[in-house]
Amino acid sequence: VIMPWYNKPFVHDHSFELVFDGWIHQHDQTFQVMVMKERSKILGFDLYLVKIPGLLDRENPYGYWDESQQFLAFQHGVLHWLTAMKIRPDILHCHDYHTGLVPFMIENCPEFNFLKGVKTVGTIHNGEYQGQMRWEMAKYFPWFYGENWGLLDWNGYINPLATMIKCCHAFN
């Protein structure tokens, strides 16, 4: 399981190992991406938390003015880690709009060619929240094949949930 890092009691009460330290570029900004693995497997599975100082190191998941950029950076950071470390999963399971751009990115961003063809499964827990953003946010995306912009579009906006529906291989 890969999730964003939030500054909550769980991260302070458990020990983590740094398994990846890299950098991503979003428009005119560069962000450090740290992937932390929980050491004890107390949850019964491997838990990886993605920490991006300035975006994914805050108290809460929601309520910030740059929420769209936060979740873009999370998805970009995860795919950068998997590509850089040559980790090719059989399936990427994407939940809600927070990871709805992953199926698009692995097929349309040359940076992630290593992951091209990985099967994706989408789960929608709440279709009311779609992560819709203005097209000017496209400048924060990793470079993608522009001719496929229609996969991102829903009623004139970038809509990560709609993108997931259009691009995922299967749903549950």
Task: Name each model feature, range by range.
Residues V1-N172:
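Catalytic cores of nucleotide-sugar-dependent glycosyltransferases that transfer UDP/GDP/TDP-activated
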